[in-house]
Amino acid sequence: KINHDESIDVDAIVADTPRATPAQVMSAITKDSVRRALFANREYVLQEDIDQAIQEQLVGMANPIEDMDPVLLRQVAYHESGHAIIQHYVMPDQRISRVSIVRRSSGTLGYMLPVDTVEMYGQPLRRIVGRIMVALAGHLAVKVFMGEFWTGATGDYNMARMEFRNLAVHGFFGPPVSELYRDVKELQFSDERVERIWVSLEEQIERMLVEHADEVEALTERLLERRDLSNKEVLEVLG
């Protein structure tokens, strides 16, 4: 039995772990959270110990950069805030489990982690479009609020391309679906249908970021202050 604070929210832990395997959850609770408590000279586990232990299982150990250039840190914060704002408004059926600008052992400088609140066995194509918007939002937020594009969005753009291919094989762009099923890599991004929708989504994202600029700025400042935000802390800013 693990000594723990009585205020631990089991429902929140369950809500934040649909992506985690039972082995990951067990390791996070029985080993990693206890290690964190011992390092803090405590004989009991707090909610934050479990939350951070689960994040370690999902995205890697925290490996913060002590002397990161403040401008670069702000860029990362704007990037993750952009993801979070668009996620909040475009994918309201998902829960933002965590937003962080703490570098992880996986190499990522920051992340926004959404999780499904119900089991998904099928979905409307608009959810795929929503995921594309979320993927593109970080890079666009940096441009909108810092005046220029930065590096750091390679993974996001790979995700967007993958989701566009996902749309294609489900008939979003019309024919020739059969050819795409044989080799989805043949989807050409010079295709006018794809380019038109891609540009349209970018324009829509930029409008939303400007419309919610106060929330972007507030979330960015909160990230710079705390570095790592839980679902509750994100919603304190976004409502």
Predicted region positions:
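Signal for well-folded cores of large energy- and translation-related assemblies
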Residues: 3, 18, 30, 34, ...
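Conserved catalytic-core segments of large NTP-driven translation/proteostasis enzymes
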Residues: 36, 43-88
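Soluble catalytic regions of large protease machineries
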Residues: 73-77, 84-239
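Conserved C-terminal "switch" segment of AAA+ ATPases
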Residues: 1-49, 135-143, 170-179
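A short, mixed-charge helix-start or loop-turn motif at secondary-structure junctions
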Residues: 14-16, 67, 187
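A general structural motif at alpha-helix termini
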Residues: 14-17, 29, 54, 103, ...
